[in-house]
Amino acid sequence: MDKVFDYEDIQLIPAKCIVDSRSECDPTVELGGFTFRLPVVPANMQTIIDEKVALMLAKNGYFYIMHRFNPETRLAFIQDMHERGLYASISVGVKDEEYGFIEVLKSTGHTPEFITIDIAHGHSNAVIRMIQHIKHHLPGSFVIAGNVGTPEAVRELEHAGADATKVGIGPGKVCITKIKTGFGTGGWQLAALRWCAKAATKPIIADGGIRTHGDIAKSIRFGASMVMIGSLFAGHDESPGETFEQDGKQLKEYFGSASEFQKGERKNVEGKKMFVEHKGALQDTLTEMEQDLQSAISYAGGDSLEALRTVDYVMVKNSIFNGDKVY
């Protein structure tokens, strides 16, 4: 493994601008036969997405992945989205009952456009078996598999039939896998992304460790097709979870998918809970992300996301903020 680095260690180098206005830059991305307005997807976590948020995102041309923590509602969710003329994108685990669920989808004719196999350690026989099961019964579904952190894992999951892989083991703000187990991509997520992307022949979704909008551009530069983000999407008007006031500030809860708050028990806990300041409307954040990404594309010297993939960069060991705190 050569020298590793993370988002704050990298600065992209500007190239000559070819547009008159950043609004000419196109930040759309294609995935699974759909074109989405941004290469960004809110994390499939209980305090980030629910049916209402999924509906808002799908209606407005954004990608979403519904979480898997209310399994009994998934079939109705797929039906509802399809009745509205929208795409359905769900998550599954790898437990025995999930095999039956996939068979039910086949027998009832409800094929979701996207299925994400969502477990903490995705480089496993359990995930490979589930990919094969889904591809056998629902060949029309675009399968995203994860999470992984090595090129070997990417190659194996692609070979098993995954249409995209999700890269990131524990770099998230409410993930404590790195602390509880000693394993993960926390602190070198961007290097892990580059390492995995070099082995990939299909799209990669970078998952975790995004703290600023500039990190989205950096993810694209190092090989991501799509970027999954939790903390920046937490705490909005539409976000699930309780809002409350403390010291005159409006706060909302945000917790990890392997936390006791999500599990309802203290067993194999690898997530924690935090409180984030209330951020207002989700659309405002999406619009700001879009504008920042358009600016990034203009700095890259192009007019589409492709321009970001080839820009030069420098390594600046942990110094780029000089103590500035933007977020």
Swiss-Prot record:
A GO MF label: GMP reductase activity
InterPro entries (UniProt xref): Aldolase_TIM, GMP_reductase, GuaC_type_2, IMP_DH/GMP_Rdtase_CS, IMP_DH_GMPRt
Listed GO CC annotations: cytosol; GMP reductase complex
SUPFAM superfamilies: Inosine monophosphate dehydrogenase (IMPDH)
NCBIfam families according to UniProt: GMP_reduct_2 (TIGR01306), PRK05458.1 (NF003966)
Stated role: Catalyzes the irreversible NADPH-dependent deamination of GMP to IMP. It functions in the conversion of nucleobase, nucleoside and nucleotide derivatives of G to A nucleotides, and in maintaining the intracellular balance of A and G nucleotides.
Cross-referenced SMART domains: IMPDH
Binding site for NADP(+): 204-227
EC number: 1.7.1.7
Enzyme class: oxidoreductase
GO BP terms, alphabetized: purine nucleotide metabolic process
Swiss-Prot/TrEMBL catalytic activity: IMP + NH4(+) + NADP(+) = GMP + NADPH + 2 H(+)
UniProt entry tagged with the keyword Cell inner membrane: no
Catalytic residues, chain numbering: 175 (thioimidate intermediate)
The protein, known as: GMP reductase
HAMAP family hit by this protein: GMP_reduct_type2 (MF_01511)
Keyword NADP appears in the UniProt entry: yes
Region forming the signal peptide: none
Alphabetically ordered keywords of this record: NADP, Oxidoreductase
Family, per entry: Belongs to the IMPDH/GMPR family. GuaC type 2 subfamily.
